[in-house]
Amino acid sequence: MPNHLRTYLVDHAALTLAVLELAKRARNSNPGGELGGFLTGIIPTLEAERKTLKEMLRRIKGSDSPLKNFAAWGAEKAGRFKLNDSLFSYSDLSRVVELEALLAATEVKTAMWDALATLAMTRSDFRDLDLGGYLRKNKTMGEKLRAFHRTAAHRALRTEEP
């Protein structure tokens, strides 16, 4: 019989690894300033999310997948090769693309924490985990990412008036 919960947790643990790597890359490309501070601030939350997913796996007698983790890690690294009108340096468009990827991942993680928080209400082995806290943090994270994205997109995509 398939263990859908295990597969779900393994897949999302791999996703959180990719998101964590992307957040670190974006932070390193945007040191200082409000965006850099925000990205620095979300990294501990992303690390805690990953740790919680791994703990949930442990509780259901599952384990992390090195193959899926490697694939997620590799996908994030491969994403660095997207050309953004600047072959060897970071561009304003790079920032927009990174923020869009973080936004998309945050939307997925928001849905995940919602599903897991709902599940935890019916499972005694998960009740002590603050899954609703992660849900709230991801909603807030998404709102802030949208604001940073709006500013970055305006800067990168504006054109001179004719």
What are these regions (language model features)?
Residues 25-37, 60-61, 116-132:
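Inter-helical turn/loop segments and adjacent helix faces that build the functional surface
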Residues 102-162:
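Preference for long, well-ordered alpha-helical segments
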Residues 56, 63, 161-162:
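Low-complexity intrinsically disordered segments
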